Amino acid sequence: MQVRNKDDILICEAIENYDSESLRNILENGADPNVRVPYQYSHLHNAIEKKNGSAVSLLLKHGADPNISGFFTPPLHKAIKKGCVDIARSLLEYGAIVNLEHYCLKPIHIAANRTESKIVKLLIEYGADINSEDGANGKYPIHYAMKVYDPFRLKIIKVLLDHGADINKQSVLTNTSPLYETRFITDDLLDYIISRGANINIKGRMGRNILHEIILRNGYNDFSNILVLIDHGADINALDDEGNTPFMLHTINNNAIILANYIVSLYYLSYKARISNGMEKNMKIINKCEYLSSCINIIKEEIERMKTFKIYDGNSFQDLSLFDLLSNEDNIAIVYRLSDTLLEKMNIIKTIFPNCFRIIQNILKMLTKRYEMLLEINNIMNANLVNTKWYTLPIEIRWMILTKLDDMILRNLLLQNETNNIKNCKKQ
Protein backbone atom coordinates (compact mmCIF):
# COMPACT_ATOMS: atom_id res chain seq x y z
CA MET A 1 0.00 0.00 0.00
CA GLN A 2 1.54 3.33 -1.09
CA VAL A 3 1.08 6.44 1.11
CA ARG A 4 1.61 10.18 0.68
CA ASN A 5 2.62 11.73 4.00
CA LYS A 6 3.99 11.02 7.44
CA ASP A 7 0.58 10.70 9.12
CA ASP A 8 -0.51 8.17 6.53
CA ILE A 9 2.66 6.17 7.09
CA LEU A 10 2.17 6.19 10.86
CA ILE A 11 -1.50 5.21 10.57
CA CYS A 12 -0.64 2.35 8.23
CA GLU A 13 2.08 1.09 10.54
CA ALA A 14 -0.20 1.27 13.57
CA ILE A 15 -2.95 -0.65 11.78
CA GLU A 16 -0.61 -3.31 10.42
CA ASN A 17 1.14 -3.71 13.79
CA TYR A 18 -2.17 -3.79 15.68
CA ASP A 19 -0.86 -0.87 17.76
CA SER A 20 -4.07 0.72 19.04
CA GLU A 21 -2.33 3.15 21.39
CA SER A 22 -0.20 4.69 18.65
CA LEU A 23 -3.18 4.88 16.30
CA ARG A 24 -5.23 6.67 18.97
CA ASN A 25 -2.47 9.23 19.53
CA ILE A 26 -2.07 9.91 15.80
CA LEU A 27 -5.81 10.43 15.31
CA GLU A 28 -6.16 12.59 18.45
CA ASN A 29 -3.37 14.80 17.10
CA GLY A 30 -5.51 15.60 14.06
CA ALA A 31 -4.59 13.04 11.40
CA ASP A 32 -7.31 12.66 8.77
CA PRO A 33 -8.83 9.13 8.91
CA ASN A 34 -10.46 9.64 5.51
CA VAL A 35 -7.32 10.28 3.48
CA ARG A 36 -7.44 8.29 0.26
CA VAL A 37 -4.19 6.82 -0.89
CA PRO A 38 -3.57 5.65 -4.48
CA TYR A 39 -6.49 3.77 -6.07
CA GLN A 40 -8.87 5.31 -3.51
CA TYR A 41 -7.87 2.77 -0.85
CA SER A 42 -8.64 4.09 2.64
CA HIS A 43 -7.26 3.41 6.10
CA LEU A 44 -10.61 1.89 6.99
CA HIS A 45 -10.24 -0.60 4.14
CA ASN A 46 -6.74 -1.44 5.35
CA ALA A 47 -7.95 -2.06 8.91
CA ILE A 48 -10.74 -4.34 7.67
CA GLU A 49 -8.31 -6.22 5.43
CA LYS A 50 -6.16 -6.89 8.51
CA LYS A 51 -9.29 -7.82 10.52
CA ASN A 52 -8.16 -5.20 13.04
CA GLY A 53 -11.39 -4.46 14.87
CA SER A 54 -9.80 -2.05 17.34
CA ALA A 55 -8.37 0.03 14.50
CA VAL A 56 -11.75 0.10 12.75
CA SER A 57 -13.43 1.35 15.94
CA LEU A 58 -10.80 4.06 16.47
CA LEU A 59 -11.00 5.27 12.87
CA LEU A 60 -14.80 5.44 13.03
CA LYS A 61 -14.72 7.19 16.40
CA HIS A 62 -12.44 9.85 14.91
CA GLY A 63 -14.62 10.49 11.88
CA ALA A 64 -13.83 7.82 9.30
CA ASP A 65 -16.61 7.56 6.71
CA PRO A 66 -18.25 4.11 7.09
CA ASN A 67 -19.43 4.33 3.46
CA ILE A 68 -16.14 5.42 1.87
CA SER A 69 -15.53 3.40 -1.27
CA GLY A 70 -14.21 5.00 -4.44
CA PHE A 71 -12.59 2.35 -6.60
CA PHE A 72 -12.79 -0.25 -3.83
CA THR A 73 -15.60 -2.17 -2.18
CA PRO A 74 -17.52 -0.22 0.49
CA PRO A 75 -16.29 -1.06 4.01
CA LEU A 76 -19.43 -2.98 5.01
CA HIS A 77 -19.25 -5.18 1.91
CA LYS A 78 -15.58 -5.84 2.65
CA ALA A 79 -16.19 -6.69 6.30
CA ILE A 80 -18.86 -9.21 5.27
CA LYS A 81 -16.54 -10.81 2.71
CA LYS A 82 -13.88 -11.15 5.42
CA GLY A 83 -16.43 -12.69 7.79
CA CYS A 84 -15.93 -9.98 10.43
CA VAL A 85 -19.19 -9.78 12.38
CA ASP A 86 -17.94 -7.34 15.04
CA ILE A 87 -16.42 -5.02 12.44
CA ALA A 88 -19.66 -5.09 10.44
CA ARG A 89 -21.57 -4.15 13.60
CA SER A 90 -19.20 -1.22 14.29
CA LEU A 91 -19.68 0.06 10.74
CA LEU A 92 -23.46 -0.16 11.04
CA GLU A 93 -23.40 1.59 14.42
CA TYR A 94 -21.52 4.48 12.82
CA GLY A 95 -23.92 4.81 9.91
CA ALA A 96 -22.92 2.32 7.21
CA ILE A 97 -25.78 2.11 4.70
CA VAL A 98 -27.20 -1.38 5.13
CA ASN A 99 -28.81 -1.51 1.66
CA LEU A 100 -25.99 0.20 -0.26
CA GLU A 101 -25.52 -1.44 -3.67
CA HIS A 102 -22.03 -1.93 -5.08
CA TYR A 103 -21.40 -3.69 -8.38
CA CYS A 104 -25.02 -4.90 -8.36
CA LEU A 105 -24.82 -6.44 -4.88
CA LYS A 106 -26.12 -5.25 -1.54
CA PRO A 107 -24.56 -6.42 1.74
CA ILE A 108 -27.38 -8.92 2.31
CA HIS A 109 -26.64 -10.67 -1.01
CA ILE A 110 -23.00 -11.10 -0.03
CA ALA A 111 -23.84 -12.22 3.51
CA ALA A 112 -26.37 -14.79 2.31
CA ASN A 113 -23.67 -16.36 0.13
CA ARG A 114 -21.30 -16.85 3.07
CA THR A 115 -21.31 -19.48 5.81
CA GLU A 116 -21.92 -17.13 8.74
CA SER A 117 -25.57 -16.71 9.70
CA LYS A 118 -24.69 -14.15 12.40
CA ILE A 119 -23.90 -11.52 9.76
CA VAL A 120 -27.24 -12.15 8.06
CA LYS A 121 -29.01 -11.67 11.40
CA LEU A 122 -27.02 -8.48 12.03
CA LEU A 123 -27.95 -6.95 8.68
CA ILE A 124 -31.61 -7.80 9.19
CA GLU A 125 -31.41 -6.18 12.64
CA TYR A 126 -30.27 -2.96 10.95
CA GLY A 127 -32.99 -3.05 8.30
CA ALA A 128 -31.59 -5.05 5.39
CA ASP A 129 -34.18 -5.81 2.71
CA ILE A 130 -34.26 -9.60 2.51
CA ASN A 131 -36.40 -9.53 -0.62
CA SER A 132 -34.24 -7.07 -2.56
CA GLU A 133 -33.09 -7.95 -6.08
CA ASP A 134 -29.48 -7.78 -7.11
CA GLY A 135 -28.72 -5.37 -9.92
CA ALA A 136 -27.54 -7.95 -12.44
CA ASN A 137 -29.93 -10.91 -12.62
CA GLY A 138 -32.70 -9.87 -10.27
CA LYS A 139 -31.75 -12.62 -7.82
CA TYR A 140 -32.75 -12.40 -4.18
CA PRO A 141 -30.77 -13.17 -1.01
CA ILE A 142 -32.48 -16.57 -0.80
CA HIS A 143 -30.96 -17.42 -4.21
CA TYR A 144 -27.49 -16.58 -2.89
CA ALA A 145 -28.04 -18.65 0.25
CA MET A 146 -28.90 -21.65 -1.92
CA LYS A 147 -25.55 -21.37 -3.71
CA VAL A 148 -23.64 -22.19 -0.54
CA TYR A 149 -22.51 -25.80 -0.28
CA ASP A 150 -21.83 -25.94 3.39
CA PRO A 151 -23.38 -27.55 6.47
CA PHE A 152 -24.31 -24.06 7.64
CA ARG A 153 -26.42 -23.12 4.62
CA LEU A 154 -29.59 -24.37 6.30
CA LYS A 155 -28.97 -21.93 9.15
CA ILE A 156 -28.75 -19.02 6.71
CA ILE A 157 -31.83 -20.19 4.80
CA LYS A 158 -33.71 -20.54 8.09
CA VAL A 159 -32.80 -17.00 9.18
CA LEU A 160 -33.99 -15.57 5.85
CA LEU A 161 -37.24 -17.54 5.89
CA ASP A 162 -37.90 -16.70 9.54
CA HIS A 163 -37.71 -13.01 8.61
CA GLY A 164 -40.05 -13.19 5.64
CA ALA A 165 -37.99 -14.31 2.64
CA ASP A 166 -40.03 -16.07 -0.04
CA ILE A 167 -38.70 -19.57 -0.75
CA ASN A 168 -40.58 -19.65 -4.07
CA LYS A 169 -39.50 -16.21 -5.29
CA GLN A 170 -38.12 -16.49 -8.82
CA SER A 171 -35.29 -14.36 -10.16
CA VAL A 172 -36.39 -11.43 -12.30
CA LEU A 173 -34.11 -11.97 -15.31
CA THR A 174 -33.86 -15.76 -15.57
CA ASN A 175 -37.18 -16.53 -13.84
CA THR A 176 -35.66 -19.45 -11.94
CA SER A 177 -36.41 -20.60 -8.40
CA PRO A 178 -33.84 -20.40 -5.57
CA LEU A 179 -33.40 -24.18 -5.74
CA TYR A 180 -31.88 -23.89 -9.22
CA GLU A 181 -28.86 -22.12 -7.70
CA THR A 182 -27.88 -25.21 -5.74
CA ARG A 183 -25.23 -27.44 -7.26
CA PHE A 184 -25.49 -30.07 -4.51
CA ILE A 185 -29.11 -30.84 -3.65
CA THR A 186 -29.43 -32.97 -0.53
CA ASP A 187 -32.25 -34.75 1.29
CA ASP A 188 -31.96 -32.51 4.34
CA LEU A 189 -32.13 -29.36 2.20
CA LEU A 190 -35.25 -30.52 0.35
CA ASP A 191 -36.93 -31.84 3.49
CA TYR A 192 -36.41 -28.47 5.16
CA ILE A 193 -37.45 -26.12 2.37
CA ILE A 194 -40.48 -28.25 1.49
CA SER A 195 -41.53 -28.11 5.15
CA ARG A 196 -41.22 -24.31 4.85
CA GLY A 197 -43.53 -24.16 1.84
CA ALA A 198 -41.20 -24.65 -1.12
CA ASN A 199 -42.95 -25.77 -4.30
CA ILE A 200 -40.34 -27.82 -6.12
CA ASN A 201 -42.62 -28.08 -9.15
CA ILE A 202 -43.06 -24.34 -9.57
CA LYS A 203 -42.62 -23.36 -13.22
CA GLY A 204 -40.35 -20.59 -14.43
CA ARG A 205 -39.06 -19.48 -17.80
CA MET A 206 -40.73 -21.21 -20.73
CA GLY A 207 -42.92 -23.13 -18.30
CA ARG A 208 -40.02 -25.29 -17.09
CA ASN A 209 -39.82 -26.87 -13.67
CA ILE A 210 -36.61 -27.55 -11.75
CA LEU A 211 -36.04 -30.88 -13.54
CA HIS A 212 -36.25 -29.23 -16.98
CA GLU A 213 -33.71 -26.62 -15.90
CA ILE A 214 -31.25 -29.02 -14.32
CA ILE A 215 -31.35 -31.46 -17.24
CA LEU A 216 -30.70 -28.59 -19.65
CA ARG A 217 -27.88 -27.37 -17.42
CA ASN A 218 -26.28 -30.82 -17.61
CA GLY A 219 -23.57 -29.94 -15.13
CA TYR A 220 -21.38 -31.84 -12.70
CA ASN A 221 -23.30 -34.03 -10.26
CA ASP A 222 -26.62 -33.03 -11.83
CA PHE A 223 -27.95 -36.57 -12.22
CA SER A 224 -27.61 -37.10 -8.48
CA ASN A 225 -29.57 -33.88 -8.05
CA ILE A 226 -32.25 -35.15 -10.45
CA LEU A 227 -32.74 -38.36 -8.46
CA VAL A 228 -32.95 -36.51 -5.13
CA LEU A 229 -35.54 -34.14 -6.61
CA ILE A 230 -37.61 -37.02 -7.99
CA ASP A 231 -37.47 -38.74 -4.60
CA HIS A 232 -39.02 -35.60 -3.11
CA GLY A 233 -41.83 -35.27 -5.63
CA ALA A 234 -40.38 -33.36 -8.59
CA ASP A 235 -42.57 -34.12 -11.62
CA ILE A 236 -40.75 -35.98 -14.40
CA ASN A 237 -43.95 -35.76 -16.49
CA ALA A 238 -44.38 -31.97 -16.32
CA LEU A 239 -44.80 -30.24 -19.69
CA ASP A 240 -43.06 -26.96 -20.50
CA ASP A 241 -44.39 -24.32 -22.92
CA GLU A 242 -42.92 -26.24 -25.87
CA GLY A 243 -44.61 -29.48 -24.84
CA ASN A 244 -41.44 -31.13 -23.54
CA THR A 245 -41.15 -33.15 -20.36
CA PRO A 246 -37.82 -33.18 -18.47
CA PHE A 247 -37.29 -36.74 -19.70
CA MET A 248 -37.66 -35.65 -23.33
CA LEU A 249 -34.73 -33.25 -22.84
CA HIS A 250 -32.45 -35.90 -21.33
CA THR A 251 -29.71 -37.55 -23.38
CA ILE A 252 -30.34 -41.24 -24.11
CA ASN A 253 -27.73 -42.95 -21.91
CA ASN A 254 -27.45 -45.20 -18.85
CA ASN A 255 -28.96 -42.50 -16.67
CA ALA A 256 -31.96 -42.32 -18.99
CA ILE A 257 -32.62 -46.01 -18.30
CA ILE A 258 -32.87 -45.24 -14.58
CA LEU A 259 -35.39 -42.51 -15.35
CA ALA A 260 -37.28 -44.78 -17.75
CA ASN A 261 -37.59 -47.43 -15.03
CA TYR A 262 -39.02 -44.80 -12.73
CA ILE A 263 -41.49 -43.50 -15.32
CA VAL A 264 -42.78 -46.96 -16.27
CA SER A 265 -43.12 -47.93 -12.59
CA LEU A 266 -45.05 -44.72 -11.97
CA TYR A 267 -47.25 -45.46 -14.97
CA TYR A 268 -48.47 -48.73 -13.46
CA LEU A 269 -48.71 -47.56 -9.85
CA SER A 270 -50.23 -44.08 -10.11
CA TYR A 271 -53.53 -43.42 -11.84
CA LYS A 272 -53.01 -39.65 -11.70
CA ALA A 273 -49.62 -39.93 -13.40
CA ARG A 274 -50.91 -42.47 -15.92
CA ILE A 275 -53.58 -40.12 -17.33
CA SER A 276 -51.30 -37.08 -17.63
CA ASN A 277 -50.25 -35.78 -21.06
CA GLY A 278 -46.63 -35.74 -19.97
CA MET A 279 -46.72 -39.42 -19.06
CA GLU A 280 -48.22 -40.23 -22.45
CA LYS A 281 -45.32 -38.47 -24.19
CA ASN A 282 -42.71 -40.11 -21.98
CA MET A 283 -44.14 -43.58 -22.58
CA LYS A 284 -44.13 -43.00 -26.35
CA ILE A 285 -40.42 -42.20 -26.23
CA ILE A 286 -39.69 -45.27 -24.11
CA ASN A 287 -41.74 -47.53 -26.39
CA LYS A 288 -40.09 -46.23 -29.57
CA CYS A 289 -36.51 -46.37 -28.30
CA GLU A 290 -35.06 -49.88 -28.45
CA TYR A 291 -32.43 -48.92 -25.87
CA LEU A 292 -35.14 -47.97 -23.35
CA SER A 293 -38.11 -50.19 -24.23
CA SER A 294 -36.59 -53.30 -22.67
CA CYS A 295 -37.37 -51.85 -19.25
CA ILE A 296 -41.14 -52.08 -19.90
CA ASN A 297 -41.32 -55.88 -19.72
CA ILE A 298 -38.98 -55.92 -16.72
CA ILE A 299 -41.23 -53.50 -14.84
CA LYS A 300 -44.36 -55.40 -15.91
CA GLU A 301 -42.93 -58.60 -14.42
CA GLU A 302 -42.23 -56.84 -11.13
CA ILE A 303 -45.73 -55.33 -11.10
CA GLU A 304 -47.25 -58.80 -11.52
CA ARG A 305 -45.15 -60.06 -8.61
CA MET A 306 -46.38 -57.11 -6.53
CA LYS A 307 -49.95 -58.28 -7.05
CA THR A 308 -49.15 -61.55 -5.26
CA PHE A 309 -46.81 -60.09 -2.62
CA LYS A 310 -49.02 -59.92 0.47
CA ILE A 311 -48.61 -57.30 3.18
CA TYR A 312 -49.72 -59.02 6.35
CA ASP A 313 -48.93 -57.79 9.85
CA GLY A 314 -50.13 -60.95 11.57
CA ASN A 315 -53.43 -59.41 12.58
CA SER A 316 -55.17 -57.86 9.60
CA PHE A 317 -55.00 -57.09 5.87
CA GLN A 318 -54.25 -60.72 5.09
CA ASP A 319 -55.36 -60.42 1.46
CA LEU A 320 -53.84 -57.00 0.78
CA SER A 321 -51.07 -57.05 -1.85
CA LEU A 322 -48.25 -54.55 -2.18
CA PHE A 323 -49.72 -53.48 -5.53
CA ASP A 324 -53.15 -52.83 -3.97
CA LEU A 325 -51.54 -50.83 -1.20
CA LEU A 326 -49.47 -48.59 -3.49
CA SER A 327 -51.83 -48.09 -6.40
CA ASN A 328 -54.74 -46.68 -4.39
CA GLU A 329 -54.20 -43.43 -2.47
CA ASP A 330 -57.32 -44.18 -0.45
CA ASN A 331 -55.18 -46.75 1.39
CA ILE A 332 -53.25 -43.92 3.03
CA ALA A 333 -54.38 -44.84 6.56
CA ILE A 334 -53.47 -48.49 5.97
CA VAL A 335 -49.98 -47.48 4.81
CA TYR A 336 -49.54 -45.51 8.02
CA ARG A 337 -50.79 -48.40 10.15
CA LEU A 338 -48.53 -50.88 8.38
CA SER A 339 -45.45 -48.63 8.37
CA ASP A 340 -43.55 -50.81 10.88
CA THR A 341 -44.39 -53.99 8.95
CA LEU A 342 -43.31 -52.38 5.68
CA LEU A 343 -40.07 -51.17 7.24
CA GLU A 344 -39.26 -54.70 8.38
CA LYS A 345 -39.88 -56.03 4.87
CA MET A 346 -38.02 -53.28 3.03
CA ASN A 347 -34.88 -55.33 2.35
CA ILE A 348 -37.01 -58.16 0.96
CA ILE A 349 -38.98 -55.69 -1.18
CA LYS A 350 -35.73 -54.22 -2.53
CA THR A 351 -34.49 -57.69 -3.49
CA ILE A 352 -37.71 -58.81 -5.17
CA PHE A 353 -38.50 -55.49 -6.88
CA PRO A 354 -35.12 -53.85 -7.63
CA ASN A 355 -36.31 -51.80 -10.61
CA CYS A 356 -39.47 -50.55 -8.91
CA PHE A 357 -37.88 -50.00 -5.52
CA ARG A 358 -37.35 -46.25 -5.91
CA ILE A 359 -41.01 -45.60 -6.73
CA ILE A 360 -42.16 -47.99 -3.97
CA GLN A 361 -40.07 -46.09 -1.42
CA ASN A 362 -41.26 -42.72 -2.67
CA ILE A 363 -44.96 -43.61 -2.68
CA LEU A 364 -44.75 -45.02 0.85
CA LYS A 365 -42.88 -41.94 2.07
CA MET A 366 -45.32 -39.59 0.35
CA LEU A 367 -48.42 -41.36 1.70
CA THR A 368 -47.00 -41.55 5.22
CA LYS A 369 -46.12 -37.86 5.27
CA ARG A 370 -49.49 -36.92 3.81
CA TYR A 371 -51.32 -38.93 6.45
CA GLU A 372 -49.32 -37.25 9.23
CA MET A 373 -50.22 -33.81 7.84
CA LEU A 374 -53.90 -34.76 7.55
CA LEU A 375 -53.95 -36.00 11.14
CA GLU A 376 -52.30 -32.81 12.40
CA ILE A 377 -54.66 -30.51 10.50
CA ASN A 378 -57.66 -32.59 11.54
CA ASN A 379 -56.65 -32.21 15.20
CA ILE A 380 -56.04 -28.47 14.81
CA MET A 381 -59.42 -27.90 13.18
CA ASN A 382 -61.29 -30.02 15.70
CA ALA A 383 -59.63 -28.10 18.56
CA ASN A 384 -60.30 -24.65 17.12
CA LEU A 385 -63.71 -25.10 15.52
CA VAL A 386 -65.66 -26.65 18.37
CA ASN A 387 -68.58 -24.22 18.17
CA THR A 388 -68.88 -24.16 14.39
CA LYS A 389 -70.67 -26.13 11.69
CA TRP A 390 -67.42 -28.03 11.06
CA TYR A 391 -67.72 -29.77 14.39
CA THR A 392 -71.29 -30.86 13.67
CA LEU A 393 -70.22 -32.78 10.56
CA PRO A 394 -69.73 -36.55 10.86
CA ILE A 395 -66.10 -37.52 11.39
CA GLU A 396 -66.04 -39.36 8.04
CA ILE A 397 -67.22 -36.24 6.18
CA ARG A 398 -64.60 -34.05 7.86
CA TRP A 399 -61.89 -36.50 6.88
CA MET A 400 -63.18 -36.75 3.30
CA ILE A 401 -63.09 -32.94 2.97
CA LEU A 402 -59.50 -32.76 4.20
CA THR A 403 -58.33 -35.53 1.87
CA LYS A 404 -59.41 -33.40 -1.11
CA LEU A 405 -56.63 -30.91 -0.28
CA ASP A 406 -53.30 -31.43 -2.03
CA ASP A 407 -50.00 -31.66 -0.16
CA MET A 408 -49.01 -28.07 -0.94
CA ILE A 409 -52.20 -26.71 0.62
CA LEU A 410 -51.76 -28.96 3.67
CA ARG A 411 -48.20 -27.71 4.22
CA ASN A 412 -49.27 -24.08 3.84
CA LEU A 413 -52.07 -24.56 6.37
CA LEU A 414 -49.63 -26.02 8.87
CA LEU A 415 -47.18 -23.18 8.26
CA GLN A 416 -49.92 -20.61 8.75
CA ASN A 417 -50.95 -22.26 12.00
CA GLU A 418 -47.34 -22.25 13.22
CA THR A 419 -46.98 -18.56 12.30
CA ASN A 420 -50.17 -17.68 14.16
CA ASN A 421 -48.99 -19.58 17.24
CA ILE A 422 -45.69 -17.66 17.22
CA LYS A 423 -47.52 -14.33 16.93
CA ASN A 424 -49.83 -15.24 19.81
CA CYS A 425 -46.88 -16.24 21.99
CA LYS A 426 -45.18 -12.89 21.32
CA LYS A 427 -48.35 -11.00 22.27
CA GLN A 428 -48.47 -12.83 25.58
Swiss-Prot record:
Residue ranges crossing the lipid bilayer per the database entry: none
ANK repeat windows: 6-35, 39-68, 71-100, 103-132, 137-169, 174-202, 206-238, 242-271
Matches recorded under Pfam families: Ank_2, PRANC
Plastid keyword on record: no
Domain of life: Viruses
Alphabetized UniProt keyword annotations: ANK repeat, Repeat
Family annotation (InterPro entries): Ankyrin_rpt (IPR002110), Ankyrin_rpt-contain_sf (IPR036770), PRANC_domain (IPR018272)
SMART domains: ANK
Listed PANTHER family: ANKYRIN REPEAT DOMAIN-CONTAINING PROTEIN 39-RELATED
Protein name: Putative ankyrin repeat protein FPV234
Organism: Fowlpox virus (strain NVSL)
Lineage of producing organism: Viruses, Varidnaviria, Bamfordvirae, Nucleocytoviricota, Pokkesviricetes
